[in-house]
Design a protein with these regions (language model features):
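Extended, small-residue-rich solenoid/repeat segments and analogous flexible loops
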Residues: 1-41, 45
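A general secondary-structure boundary signal
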Residues: 24-25, 64, 69, 160-161
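Flexible, glycine/small-residue-enriched loop-and-beta-strand segment within the central core
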Residues: 35-42, 47-138, 167-168, 174-176
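Glycine-centered loop/turn positions within well-structured domains
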Residues: 60, 152, 160-162, 170
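Conserved catalytic segment of ABC-fold P-loop ATPases
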Residues: 143-146, 159-161
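Short helix N-cap motif at coil->helix boundaries in the Bergerat
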Residues: 156
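Conserved beta-strand-loop-alpha-helix hinge in the C-terminal portion
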Residues: 162-164, 168-184
Length: 186
C-alpha cells in the first residue's frame, strides 16, 4: 500500500515537472521522456512504464485505465481511448519522416503527417490490446476491442472487434456479434 502511494506520488510530481495535464492516480515510471508536455493529457489510473518516450504533437490524450508498457515511443497527435493495454517495445507515431530532398540527410528533413486514411490523428479504440514490437504509423484508427499481434506493422485503419497480424497488418479474426464468437478469416 505504501509502495503504491509512493509510485503514484512520484507520478504526480513527474506530471507537474513535465507540464502534463493529469488526473489523480497516475503512475509514470523512471526515465520517461516527455516533449511538449503541455499538449499531453493523462486521465485517471494511467500507468506509463519506465523508459517510454512521449513526443506530443498538438494533442496527445491517454484515457482512463490505460497501461503503456516499457520502452514504447509515442510521437505526434495520438488519442488512446479508455482501458487500452500496450505491451513493451512499440513504435506508435502519427507522423513519418520526410525524405524527398536527396541533397539532405533524412534526419534533417523533418516529419509530416501522411493522412493516408483521412484522419487528423492516430487513434487506438477503447479496450484494445497492442502486443509487443508493433509499429503503428500514420493517421491510423484502430477500432474498439481490437488485438494487434506481436511484430505487426499497421498503416491502415482497423475496424472494431478485429485481430490483426503480420507485415503489413491483415485481419485474421473478427468478432461476430450475432454468434458471440471470434471467427477466423481466410
Amino acid at each position: 500500500m505504501i509502495k503504491n502511494f509512493v509510485k503514484h506520488f512520484l507520478g504526480s510530481i513527474r506530471c507537474h515537472l513535465n507540464g502534463i495535464e493529469c488526473s489523480r492516480v497516475v503512475y509514470i515510471g523512471k526515465n520517461v521522456r516527455v516533449v511538449n508536455g503541455k499538449n499531453v493529457t493523462l486521465v485517471k489510473n494511467v500507468s506509463i512504464r519506465p523508459d517510454c518516450d512521449l513526443f506530443a504533437g498538438t494533442k496527445m490524450f491517454i484515457g482512463d485505465y490505460c497501461d503503456l508498457g516499457t520502452r514504447n515511443r509515442f510521437t505526434g497527435n495520438i488519442i488512446i481511448e479508455n482501458s487500452v493495454l500496450i505491451g513493451p517495445d512499440n513504435y506508435i507515431a502519427s507522423v513519418d519522416h520526410c525524405y524527398e530532398d536527396i541533397s539532405k540527410p533524412v534526419m534533417n528533413q523533418g516529419v509530416y503527417s501522411p493522412h493516408n486514411n483521412g484522419h487528423q490523428e492516430l487513434r487506438i479504440g477503447e479496450g484494445s490490446w497492442i502486443g509487443t514490437h508493433v509499429s503503428i504509423v500514420g493517421d491510423v484508427h484502430i477500432g474498439k476491442h481490437c488485438v494487434i499481434a506481436a511484430n505487426t506493422v499497421v498503416t491502415r485503419d482497423v475496424p472494431d472487434y478485429c485481430v490483426v497480424a503480420g507485415v503489413p497488418a491483415r485481419m485474421i479474426k473478427k468478432y461476430n456479434i450475432e454468434t458471440k464468437e471470434w471467427e477466423k478469416l481466410k
